[in-house]
Design a protein with these regions (language model features):
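Intrinsically disordered, polar/acidic, low-complexity terminal segments
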Residues: 2-59, 63, 69-91, 99-112, ...
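Membrane-interface micro-motifs in multi-pass membrane enzymes
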Residues: 58, 62, 85-88, 106-149, ...
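Hydrophobic, aromatic-rich transmembrane alpha-helices
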Residues: 93, 263, 267-302
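Membrane-interface transmembrane helices that cradle and orient dolichyl/undecaprenyl
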Residues: 141-155, 187-192
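Membrane-interface alpha helices of multi-pass inner-membrane proteins
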Residues: 154-170, 175-181
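Perimembrane helix-loop-helix junctions
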Residues: 175-209
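Aromatic-rich transmembrane-lumenal/periplasmic boundary elements in polytopic membrane proteins
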Residues: 211-242
């Protein structure tokens, strides 16, 4: 029997160098960018209620999330959860490297850097209590595609991986679908028998169909066992009702959202430099496609135009599958991670199909005469530089968001200290007194001071001034960060008080009349005095 060291040495001989590069580059770049957040306890508004949460989200269709998040315990411990999340993401980088057949270590580093720097990861870090589970879901989604590509019956194992991925977080279904589409496109581009290509395409389709059927079956069984139904949260109760008018009614929203987020979402690019980098990457991709089209005489084939049309019509839908699954969803940035694949695909496509004849020319004239080699070289260089610029820009954006999240915490802490002092100093207060409170911080008394809105506007959970939106947020913050246990009334009870004359006439905190006791209940008014 081999010793542990001998086993490790034997395993090490099986690991490809580019896998090590992908894994280590993801970890190193990830720690350099995200360590400030992972070493801090800076929750967002959802994090306040998730200091300990078993992640049993079966009613949201996430039947595997409780297991996926269980490795790090159910406590919100950013450093441990963050490390596990980065390890799973590094695994995704390795799978992508093998899936895309990346050999060039520079390209491997660029792909890994884009994956770990993209602001959707920072947005997920803001919801750190689910970070490790979500990154495991992404790993499984990517692995499902690789299994189909590598093995004849890999679509079966891939279907299982896809089912568990969707059972952890439905948003990463788009991640798998886009990768499948790209693999099919590469299949069509490269040499081979059409019958063989068709069989491989069918395997990708089978993986998706079987995987989703398995997901629904497991979900139905677990809901029945637990005696629960799908919740209305994020429109999940309508999941699967996409036939007929339901699907057609969402098509417009899908295309509008795709175009608006891509062009004006302030995430893919948010300044001149990142805008130019995305433009350069797009131009490199287009030029490479045009060269391949001319060289392969694709422009003479009707199938070429059919494929282009299908891609133009299908990719926005594939990217926004969450809008079909949950049409009423609040589309958080952490649900938009799949957009990074377009950047990764551009880098891969250029390096794969433009870099095969890379030669060096003596001068510009020779470069013009020898378009084959030098154009390839310029395309590879331009795409690489653009990717580096984007990685750096995303790193800056991530840390701007982290800085604002920390300031949100500090502002919330200062606000709650003042409010708690007022509550405890109000005549009639005693420990356990029922407190009636809406929770929103009024902008009349506390004007917005967030200066990062231009960059964090679409990063839900990391933008704004305060962590407080509901009475439950106040209760959790004061309990976990101020050590105060307060008895807030349920929202249903608060509804009647909110419309009472006594409450309407109160000042907004920190007004003199913003906290008082009425009939044994403490009224606390924090929202604007004047209602719209």
């Amino acid at each position: 029997m081999l010793t542990p060291m001998q086993t490790l040495e034997k395993v090490n001989t099986k690991i490809k160098p580019q896998w090590k590069t992908a894994f280590l580059s993801t970890l190193v770049i990830g720690l350099l960018i995200h360590m400030p957040a992972l070493l801090s306890d800076i929750p967002n508004h959802d994090g306040l209620d998730s200091m300990y949460f078993d992640q049993n989200m079966i009613t949201s269709g996430r039947w595997f999330l409780t297991v996926a998040c269980g490795f790090s315990s159910y406590f919100s411990i950013p450093w441990m959860i963050g490390l596990l999340g980065l390890l799973f993401l590094a695994g995704t980088s390795v799978v992508l490297t093998e899936l895309l057949e990346l050999k060039d270590k520079t390209v491997v580093c660029l792909v890994s850097g884009l994956l770990v720097a993209f602001p959707a990861f920072a947005s997920t870090v803001a919801y750190v209590f689910t970070l490790d589970g979500y990154m495991l879901a992404m790993f499984l989604a990517t692995l499902s595609v690789l299994l189909v590509k590598k093995f004849r019956y890999g679509f079966l194992a891939g279907a299982v991986c896809l089912a568990f991925s969707v059972g952890t977080y439905q948003a990463y279904l788009s991640f798998a679908v886009i990768l499948c589409v790209y693999m099919i496109v590469r299949l069509l581009i490269e040499q081979g028998e059409w019958k063989d290509k068709l069989r491989k395409v069918c395997r990708y389709l089978l993986m998706g169909v079987i995987g989703l059927i398995l997901y629904v079956v497991v979900l139905s069984v677990l809901l029945a066992v637990q005696g629960k139904e799908l919740a209305s949260y994020q429109g999940i109760s309508g999941m699967g009702n996409v036939a007929g008018t339901g699907l057609l009614g969402n098509i417009k929203n899908i295309y509008v959202d795709f175009v608006s987020f891509t062009g004006a979402g302030n995430i893919l690019f948010n300044n001149v430099f990142s805008g130019l980098a995305v433009a350069v990457l797009a131009v490199c991709l287009i030029v490479t496609v045009v060269r391949k089209t001319i060289g392969g005489k694709w422009w003479k084939k009707l199938t070429f135009y059919a494929v282009l049309l299908l891609l133009a019509l299908g990719l926005p839908v594939a990217t926004n599958l969450i809008l079909i699954i949950s049409p009423d969803v609040t589309y958080h940035l952490l649900m938009r991670y799949q957009w990074v694949l377009y950047l990764i695909i551009a880098v891969d496509f250029v390096s794969r199909y433009a870099g095969k004849q890379n030669t060096v020319c003596a001068d510009f004239r020779e470069c013009m005469e020898r378009t084959g080699g030098c154009v390839s070289g310029w395309l590879c260089w331009a795409a690489s530089v653009a990717a580096v610029i984007l990685i750096f820009n995303y790193a800056v954006t991530d840390n701007i968001a982290y800085a604002n999240l920390e300031k949100k915490y500090e502002k919330t802490y200062a606000y709650c200290v003042r409010l708690l002092d007022r509550i405890e100093q109000t005549e009639g207060y005693y420990q356990g007194i029922p407190i009636a409170m809406i929770g929103v911080v009024g902008d009349e008394q506390f004007p917005v001071t967030d200066i990062t809105g231009e960059f964090t506007g679409n990063m839900i959970g990391m933008n704004g001034d305060s962590l407080l939106y509901t009475g439950a947020n106040y209760e959790a913050f004061m309990k976990h960060y101020l050590g105060a246990t307060l008895n807030f009334l349920e929202p249903e009870v608060m509804n009647d008080i909110y419309y009472s004359d006594e409450y309407v006439e109160m000042d907004s905190f920190p007004g003199k009349n913003s906290v008082k006791v009425v009939d044994g209940i403490m009224y606390v008014k924090t929202e604007n005095k004047n209602r719209d």
